[in-house]
Amino acid sequence: MKAKRITAAFKHLALTLLGLALLAACSVSTPKPDAPPSTTPGTYAKANWKALPAVSDSDLQAGFAAWRGACPRLKSDATWAPTCAAAANIATTPSAVRQFLQANLDVYALRAANNRADGLITGYYEPIYAGSLTRTAKASVPVYGVPDDMVSVQLDSLYPELKGKRLRGRVEGRVLKPYDDAARIAANGVKAPVLAWLTSPMDLQFLQIQGSGRVQLADGRQLRIAYADQNGHPYRPIGRWLVEQGELKQADVSMAAIRAWADAHPARVPELLASNPSYVFFTRGPDSDDGPRGSLNVPLTAGYSVAVDRNVVPLGSLLWLSTTRPDGTALVRPVAAQDTGGAITGEVRADLFWGTGDAAGELAGHMKQKGTIWMLWPKGVALPKAPDPAN
């Protein structure tokens, strides 16, 4: 994160204003802003390997490879470091992978607060949008880096029980105020570097929702853009606003439907975008053919990396996912928890990364399926402690 950490001079100020600022919607999220914890005790139900639906050998190998590829990032993680070390030299044959998993990991079914086993499985992707490095008549929508005047408080430095939570705002005199919401930023701009210029405000909105993307330049180059920080306001789905306005039915909400509505109602696009006060700031990503980096800071693997609620599933965990594709065909495979998302909250909840470009976007945009999830957890290691919803 490139947002400035608040200095010691402001520490007492942050303590005084913490409650007020939280009420004023300075969110305390981590990459891709997280909603408040929704977990309750009893999230993890002990199961066994026989309870897991069968997967193909190729999916087993690919899911294991996606998880093991993140192990260098987990060397200092007390939960996963020993298992990662044991996995380093395991052959990737289906039999070797199965034997390793069953010998080292226990199975826990994720359960919602009402003890339901099924939840929502959605999809996301890395979009590619036309743009420019300079402002032009056609490309006039800025992609901002982190603002110079936005300060950030890592709250666990003040309150250990708020580990991973962050407060963002702007200091005016000796007062810490909420940072501008999306509508004010769109109208007035911010004191931030402009990484690129896009041709459509809807492209920018979808780039912010996906959390990363690429800008296609006129000379054929592609500029990779990655999540850097967020303005501290809560994420509110623009599709929900369209439903509330009577413009779309809930069952019809998709990226394609939202885009079609915006194309048909250009005068109302600012109103649509203002319904989501959250605003994402970006940084330049590495020029690589690998997937974009998620919250775990490892390249995502198309079809085998998922975003999760980190209050339920710690990043780096291996999951067993059973759901369907948008066309209704079965999708069962191990997946790696390597990202988070503002809309990804709850116990039985995952967002499957589909890859880069339009084909991946078509799958992601229509992915709104029921599914069940099992967490594979190292033997002998205590389960994650469900957070107190009061916090």
Regions found by a protein language model. Name each.
Residues 27-29, 45, 56-63, 73, ...:
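C-terminal soluble interaction/assembly domains
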Residues 23-25:
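C-terminal motif of bacterial Sec signal peptides marking the signal peptidase cleavage site
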